[in-house]
Design a protein with these regions (language model features):
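Signature of long, low-cysteine stretches enriched in small and polar/charged residues
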Residues: 27-74
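Sec/Tat-exported extracytoplasmic proteins
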Residues: 18-35, 108-116
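Detector for Asparagine
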Residues: 4, 11, 38, 80-82
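Short, solvent-exposed coil/turn segments at beta-strand boundaries
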Residues: 52-53, 77-83
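A mature extracytoplasmic/lumenal domain signature
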Residues: 3, 60-63, 74-77, 88-92
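A short acidic-to-branched-hydrophobic micro-motif
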Residues: 1-20
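Surface-exposed amphipathic alpha-helical segments
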Residues: 86-117
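Generic signature of intrinsically disordered, low-complexity, basic-rich segments
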Residues: 21-23, 67, 97
Length: 117
Protein backbone atom coordinates (compact mmCIF):
# COMPACT_ATOMS: atom_id res chain seq x y z
CA UNK A 1 0.00 0.00 0.00
CA UNK A 2 0.83 3.65 -0.10
CA UNK A 3 2.94 5.20 2.64
CA UNK A 4 3.26 8.82 3.69
CA UNK A 5 -0.01 9.83 2.04
CA UNK A 6 -0.27 13.64 2.15
CA UNK A 7 -3.41 15.02 3.80
CA UNK A 8 -6.20 16.36 1.65
CA UNK A 9 -7.95 15.55 -1.59
CA UNK A 10 -5.99 17.47 -4.20
CA UNK A 11 -2.53 15.92 -4.03
CA UNK A 12 -1.06 13.59 -6.64
CA UNK A 13 -1.25 10.45 -4.46
CA UNK A 14 -4.98 10.86 -3.79
CA UNK A 15 -5.69 11.77 -7.42
CA UNK A 16 -3.83 8.67 -8.63
CA UNK A 17 -5.69 6.44 -6.16
CA UNK A 18 -9.02 7.92 -7.25
CA UNK A 19 -8.25 6.97 -10.85
CA UNK A 20 -7.68 3.39 -9.63
CA UNK A 21 -11.03 3.44 -7.84
CA UNK A 22 -12.78 4.33 -11.09
CA UNK A 23 -10.83 1.61 -12.90
CA UNK A 24 -12.06 -0.91 -10.29
CA UNK A 25 -15.67 -0.10 -11.16
CA UNK A 26 -14.96 -0.66 -14.84
CA UNK A 27 -13.16 -3.92 -14.01
CA UNK A 28 -16.22 -5.18 -12.09
CA UNK A 29 -18.17 -4.93 -15.34
CA UNK A 30 -15.51 -6.85 -17.28
CA UNK A 31 -15.54 -9.58 -14.60
CA UNK A 32 -19.33 -9.86 -14.86
CA UNK A 33 -19.96 -8.73 -11.27
CA UNK A 34 -22.07 -5.82 -12.52
CA UNK A 35 -23.48 -4.84 -15.90
CA UNK A 36 -23.76 -1.63 -17.83
CA UNK A 37 -21.44 0.63 -15.86
CA UNK A 38 -22.30 4.15 -17.02
CA UNK A 39 -19.46 6.51 -16.16
CA UNK A 40 -19.95 9.98 -17.67
CA UNK A 41 -16.98 11.94 -18.94
CA UNK A 42 -15.80 14.55 -16.48
CA UNK A 43 -16.83 12.26 -13.63
CA UNK A 44 -14.13 13.51 -11.25
CA UNK A 45 -15.29 16.45 -9.14
CA UNK A 46 -14.31 18.13 -5.89
CA UNK A 47 -16.62 18.79 -2.96
CA UNK A 48 -16.98 22.38 -1.82
CA UNK A 49 -18.51 22.00 1.64
CA UNK A 50 -18.41 25.11 3.82
CA UNK A 51 -16.88 25.10 7.28
CA UNK A 52 -15.03 22.43 9.20
CA UNK A 53 -14.16 19.01 7.81
CA UNK A 54 -12.21 17.58 4.89
CA UNK A 55 -13.04 18.01 1.23
CA UNK A 56 -13.15 15.04 -1.13
CA UNK A 57 -12.47 14.23 -4.74
CA UNK A 58 -15.57 12.35 -5.85
CA UNK A 59 -17.39 10.84 -8.77
CA UNK A 60 -20.82 9.40 -9.44
CA UNK A 61 -21.78 6.67 -11.87
CA UNK A 62 -24.49 4.08 -12.46
CA UNK A 63 -24.34 0.32 -12.76
CA UNK A 64 -26.78 -2.53 -13.18
CA UNK A 65 -26.60 -4.96 -10.27
CA UNK A 66 -28.83 -8.01 -10.76
CA UNK A 67 -31.39 -6.13 -12.84
CA UNK A 68 -31.57 -3.02 -10.68
CA UNK A 69 -29.78 0.16 -11.74
CA UNK A 70 -27.82 1.56 -8.82
CA UNK A 71 -26.52 5.11 -8.47
CA UNK A 72 -23.08 4.96 -6.89
CA UNK A 73 -20.78 7.70 -5.63
CA UNK A 74 -17.24 7.38 -4.33
CA UNK A 75 -15.57 10.05 -2.19
CA UNK A 76 -11.84 10.05 -1.43
CA UNK A 77 -9.49 12.11 0.72
CA UNK A 78 -6.51 11.47 2.99
CA UNK A 79 -6.26 12.08 6.73
CA UNK A 80 -3.39 11.20 9.09
CA UNK A 81 -1.47 9.38 6.37
CA UNK A 82 -4.41 7.15 5.36
CA UNK A 83 -6.93 7.16 2.55
CA UNK A 84 -10.53 7.75 3.58
CA UNK A 85 -12.88 6.31 0.97
CA UNK A 86 -16.66 6.57 1.19
CA UNK A 87 -18.91 4.67 -1.19
CA UNK A 88 -22.64 5.24 -1.21
CA UNK A 89 -25.20 3.38 -3.32
CA UNK A 90 -28.94 3.65 -3.76
CA UNK A 91 -31.46 2.68 -6.46
CA UNK A 92 -31.37 5.07 -9.42
CA UNK A 93 -34.21 7.55 -9.17
CA UNK A 94 -34.63 7.10 -5.40
CA UNK A 95 -34.69 10.75 -4.36
CA UNK A 96 -34.72 9.90 -0.64
CA UNK A 97 -31.72 7.61 -1.16
CA UNK A 98 -29.90 10.45 -2.89
CA UNK A 99 -30.68 12.90 -0.07
CA UNK A 100 -29.66 10.36 2.58
CA UNK A 101 -26.35 9.68 0.81
CA UNK A 102 -25.53 13.40 0.62
CA UNK A 103 -26.41 13.89 4.29
CA UNK A 104 -24.25 10.89 5.27
CA UNK A 105 -21.20 12.34 3.50
CA UNK A 106 -21.78 15.76 5.03
CA UNK A 107 -22.11 14.32 8.54
CA UNK A 108 -19.17 11.91 8.28
CA UNK A 109 -16.87 14.72 7.16
CA UNK A 110 -17.76 16.60 10.35
CA UNK A 111 -16.78 13.51 12.36
CA UNK A 112 -13.54 13.13 10.39
CA UNK A 113 -12.74 16.81 10.91
CA UNK A 114 -13.56 16.60 14.64
CA UNK A 115 -15.88 19.56 14.12
CA UNK A 116 -17.79 21.02 17.04
CA UNK A 117 -20.49 22.83 15.05
Amino acid sequence: GEKNIPAGHDNEVVQRHFAKVLDEAKAMEKLGKVRAVNMPSGIKQTTKYPGCGPQFVWGAFEMDMTGQVIASSTYLTAINGNFVKLRVHYPKGDEQGHKTALLFVEKIRKVLGKCTD
